[in-house]
């Protein structure tokens, strides 16, 4: 299909082959300076957020105080940021949608659609969300000429790069509109997800006692008793596992999930042990619901609840609270305290935690009934966060797939 210049997926009623155009044939460069100070809003381009207020994005002002020599960009106009990043290996091309106008450094290449009756602005936005244009930039960027991540791309060469597009404006518009709606849905779910994360962080601060206090700021109705402080080791049994010798193939490939620290919240594992591997090593079994605490490396301080019955290695501490203590409550406290634990016990984030350190941690506990109420509240909140995260990932995967199949 691609050889015929037709995409794999199209809207009904469109059959013509797409055409290849030079960017400069459908857009025109803008070199308008901000001489009359029409705008004092400094902009930057983020691969994720598009054209955005520079002060908010960097949390400080990067632009000069005098912006009269900057390009003036108006709503609906485009800009190419030649700076590269992991998200934008060949820079980013975005349209100004958030503000009526703003100013950009003259290092950017600014342009607008020449004739919006023939070229859909939304289509151009979407096209530059694909990676189809990267090859053209790669061809014109001067070899080795990267100055602090800034590509050496001349404006004249930039406008000579190719893009493919439907001849029919109606098809362009439908494609652009489809992705604009998809982006709107993604933004809605992202906002809900972000709000829930902020809510959880705030409630974790308010529903557990602060240092020096014996009660929290917010409590469920009906609970008035003071809380008591106990060490993790006093209220639970805990143990770490081990790793069977990797050179013995008979120890691996069995039916026992082998949970490693990056998998403490996962329902699947990459490795499986045999009964022989379990027997001939320090690996220990855990049950569904056990608290799993990561001790080593990049995941130090991460907390999970076992999603499956399996074995753990030495990088994980399994914690099983006694019957008077709620697992979910303790897991939430450990999550809330991750930053302070890392700061206290790991110098500069380096090194490992240990079972001894975790068992000595002091935790504030209310009655079991109140623990269960708090743990249940945060479990529901976590489920809601996970739901929005999955929806977000699903929509992002749909977008990625459609960007690949609806363009040539």
What are these regions (language model features)?
Residues 62, 68, 148, 280-281, ...:
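A structural connector/turn signal
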Residues 67-135, 154, 260-262, 270-335:
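A short beta-sheet element
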Residues 24-27, 118, 162, 287:
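IQ-motif-like calmodulin-binding regions
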Residues 3-7, 102-107, 142-171, 310-317, ...:
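A short glycine-rich beta-alpha junction/loop motif
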Residues 1-19, 168-228, 369-408:
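Amphipathic alpha-helical segments with low aromatic content
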Residues 10-34, 219-242, 267:
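Non-catalytic DNA-recognition/assembly elements of restriction-modification systems
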Residues 27, 33-63, 103-104, 233-236, ...:
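DNA target-recognition patches
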Residues 127-147, 331-348:
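Charged, low-complexity intrinsically disordered regulatory segments in eukaryotic signaling
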